[in-house]
């Protein structure tokens, strides 16, 4: 399931050359690049190249349809769109769109943009320079673009690195590269020297094979992916003694799934709660959690994160009472792109209103109690009935 590998030196050079090509096309600091590409090497190269120019990258999940691509493109008004021919439908005609190959070969990745041997001027350090836009799942209607700058990505790196997946080892991204779980974390993963296994199309048997073959210490993804791995016919053909943790987010994990995963992989299961707006950082069950915490809660705030449950008047409620979950974390988005009114309603006095209902139990763990809307979750993404 793996394509030709590319080393860090080559990745740096290729993204340098593509950055110069992007600059010749008019991308500059503050420009917006929209990627409607598979989760492969061209996506990664384009993201790095844009960042080297100070441009902002927004990604479209390949699973979305044409009408959804239309909404996302209109949300961010990109200066340039890169798309493969199977993922271009719905991109408005008035935008500048380039069709590119989805080839994962280093020699072919965005070849039309490469300026051999050239590199862009290095930008001065600026913690407030925007880097990426991650689209929300549309739990209250149309998706919104959550903007993240260097400051937030550095905070995420500080909070997220090490732990369950260590540093400098092998990792399989559990989401599409356009998802907040990848876009806000690729930076620290690359800086740590991680070997990333990029999968255009996630398949349980492929992931199980990679985990076994490369002795990958952490299983990551959403609950539905874990269920597919447990049910895959090839599961018992593999040795998973290497697995030290199962780290799952993007939606609830049923107790029966947690129990089965812990038993079959022989590893602890950390259920994570976060949101696009929080940068994928929030609450987590401990790897050494007792059954009550592991099976029925989303744990406690991770280091560096504050959490509160408040009523409709924004006042903290007593333990055991249900209210809206608020988070305070340096990883939270800068704003919603082009939506100051909703930003002001969501980011309040340094806190992020999640729109999720929760209560705190007698162990200090948080238990979710639904949302204030009627969306449902599919593979880590909220799905709007419309």
Enumerate the predicted regions with their spans.
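Gly/Ser/Thr-rich phosphate-binding loop
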Residues: 191, 216-220, 230-292, 306, ...
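Conserved structural elements of the adenylate-forming
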Residues: 12-20, 127, 146-167, 174, ...
């Amino acid at each position: 399931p793996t394509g030709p590998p590319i080393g860090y030196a080559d990745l740096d050079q290729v993204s340098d050359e593509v950055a110069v090509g992007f600059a010749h096309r008019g991308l500059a600091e503050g420009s917006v690049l929209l990627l409607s590409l598979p989760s492969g090497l061209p996506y990664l190269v384009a993201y790095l190249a844009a960042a080297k120019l100070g441009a902002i990258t927004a990604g479209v999940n390949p699973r979305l349809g044409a009408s959804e691509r239309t909404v996302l493109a209109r949300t961010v008004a990109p200066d340039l769109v890169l798309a493969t021919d199977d993922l271009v439908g719905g991109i408005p005609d008035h935008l500048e769109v380039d069709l590119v190959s989805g080839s994962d070969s280093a020699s072919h990745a965005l070849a039309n943009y490469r300026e051999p041997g050239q590199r862009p001027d290095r930008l001065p350090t600026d913690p407030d320079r925007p880097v990426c836009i991650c689209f929300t799942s549309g739990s209250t209607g149309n998706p919104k673009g959550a903007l993240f700058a260097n400051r937030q990505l550095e905070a995420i790196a500080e909070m997220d690195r090490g732990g369950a997946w260590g540093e400098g080892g092998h990792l399989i991204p559990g989401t599409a590269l356009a998802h907040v779980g990848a876009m806000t974390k690729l930076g620290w993963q690359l800086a740590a020297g991680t070997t990333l296994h990029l999968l255009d199309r996630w398949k349980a048997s492929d992931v199980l094979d990679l985990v076994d073959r490369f002795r990958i210490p952490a299983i990551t993804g959403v609950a539905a992916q874990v269920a597919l791995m447990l049910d895959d016919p090839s599961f018992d053909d593999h040795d998973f003694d290497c697995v030290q943790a199962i780290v799952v987010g993007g939606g609830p994990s049923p107790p029966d799934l947690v129990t089965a995963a812990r038993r079959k992989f022989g590893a602890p299961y950390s259920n994570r709660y976060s949101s696009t707006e929080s940068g994928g950082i929030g609450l987590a069950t401990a790897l050494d959690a007792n059954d009550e915490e592991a099976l029925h809660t989303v744990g406690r705030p991770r280091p560096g994160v504050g959490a509160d449950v408040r009523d409709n008047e924004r006042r903290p409620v007593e333990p055991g009472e249900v209210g809206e979950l608020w988070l305070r974390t340096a990883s939270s988005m800068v704003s919603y792109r082009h939506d100051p009114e909703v930003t002001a309603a969501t980011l309040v006095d340094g806190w992020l209103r999640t729109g999720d209902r929760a209560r705190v139990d007698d162990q200090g763990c948080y238990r979710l109690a639904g949302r204030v809307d009627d969306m449902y979750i599919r593979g880590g993404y909220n799905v709007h009935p419309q």
